[in-house]
Amino acid sequence: MTHSSGAYWEERASQLISSRGATVIARNYTCRFGEIDLIALDGERLVFIEVRYRKRPHFGSALASVSPAKQQKVLMTAQIFLTSHECYCNRYCRFDIIAFDGPRDSVSAQWLKGAFGVAEHPNYE
């Protein structure tokens, strides 16, 4: 996915998030471990969101494209975010994927809440 394509799908995901009552508080948060596409508040819960798009399913769906290695990078990046933004460090956290599959004119969207996480951290689901 090119940068401009990524920005397009992240904006679409942001609109989906807003339409469901959550608020995006950060976009493209980056640290040495990686990047988190969107960070949102869903009620009192802090949500870290990976956005994916696949035009064709030849190599799997957009949802399936979030590998365990990518999940680990998102988890480590979230820890850095929480360390550097103390106002959010006591909130429960969730890790979601918003996946878009198909051509732009007939794309399907799927928001998988709690797609991955770590059991040993008290604030992660």
Regions found by a protein language model. Give the residues of each.
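Mid-chain, well-packed structural core segment of small domains
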Residues: A64-C93
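Domain-level recognition of nuclease-like catalytic cores that cleave nucleotide substrates
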Residues: S84-E125
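Conserved catalytic cores of phosphodiester-cleaving nucleases, focusing on short active-site segments
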Residues: I17, I36-F59, V74
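Protein kinase-like catalytic core scaffold
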Residues: G34, R45-V47, D96, Q110
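Short acidic/glycine-enriched loop/turn segments that link adjacent beta-strands
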Residues: C31-G34, D105
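Acidic-basic catalytic patches of nuclease active cores, encompassing PD-(D/E)XK
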Residues: M1-R27
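Residues at secondary-structure transition points
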Residues: S4, Y8, F33, P57, ...
